[in-house]
Amino acid sequence: VIKVYLRYSILVLFLFPNALSSQELFIGISGGLSNYQGDLLNNISTLSQSRAVGGMYAQLYPFPYLSISGGFNFAKIGAADKFNVQPDLRARNLSFVSNLQEGYLTLQIDFFNYERIKITPYIFGGVALFHYNPYTYDTGGEKVFLHSLTTEAQGSPDYPEHPPYKLTNYSLPFGGGITYHVTQLISVGAQLGFRKTFTDYLDDVSTTYPDQETLLQYAGQKSVELTFRGDELNSSAPYPSSTGVRGDPNYKDWYYFTVIKLGVSLSGIHFKTGGKNFGYGNTQRKLSKKKISCPKF
């Protein structure tokens, strides 16, 4: 994911510096909270299961109200049934954690002209490519990656309706935020961004429980142990039937970020390439309101 985006970013910066010289270019960092919504967590506002996200970005303004952003986010997502308020889901006793890397490209529309007004709300939307790999911890505290265990017998000839899922997918990011231009060169902001994915396996949970004996022969004892973990809470809890609901495939998983952003404009910053000077941005931009004169009588 990162290699692909870096190639295109470097290509744009070094092949087209003259085309960008009259436009405003910001670079920055971001950090905040990451969340997930899916079969293990239906509530998008659960702060107790939030995790961290950090990122870097570049933002180009071809027009005062319109900008194009590209960047990378590095996050962690996760959830556990033990925090669920529903008794039947707590009894399921599943959990997962996943590191998530994302590269994205979005289009942002500001409500106000950033060259005239220091503070402006905005909305954005775009496309992203992300990689994840869910894991959990067994009863001995050992970290176990779930994809290779095929906990729902993905890929088994006995379950053709359960195909293996991919660890690299695309999503549709969208959301909004607010930006405050502290000076001509520095901006800070807050953003809430949702990611609509097209997979139901961020949490490794999607459909029904596979037959216990079939799963044992296909994937081994460790897969059986981590497919159903209710017996860890109640030793007399039986393994569910092959028609038992483990997840809901009708609803895809989501992830989203709530971040604070810090940006620096490259206006007035020049560098040499092949003996020529290049620069980015409008060095004469001023972030000030128009003066309003008092009426005369």
Task: Show where each model-derived region lies.
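Short loop/turn motifs that connect adjacent beta-strands in outer-membrane beta-barrel proteins
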Residues: S21-E24, Y65, N113-T120, T183-L185, ...
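Short glycine/proline- and aromatic-enriched beta-strand/turn motifs that initiate or cap beta-hairpins
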Residues: S22-Y61, W254-H270, F297
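Residues on the lipid-exposed face of transmembrane beta-strands in outer-membrane beta-barrel proteins
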Residues: I29-G31, M56-L60, L105-I109, G125-V127, ...
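Outer-membrane beta-barrel proteins
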Residues: Y36-N42, G78-F83, H131-Y137, S187, ...
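Extracellular loop and loop/strand-boundary signature of outer-membrane beta-barrel proteins
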Residues: D39-S45, D88-F96, D158-P164, V245-D248
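Residues that define the transmembrane beta-barrel architecture of outer-membrane proteins
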Residues: S48-A52, N99-G103, I119, T168-L172, ...
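Gram-negative (and chloroplast) outer-membrane scaffold detector with strong preference
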Residues: Y65-S148
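Outer-membrane beta-barrel transmembrane domain signature
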Residues: A128-D253
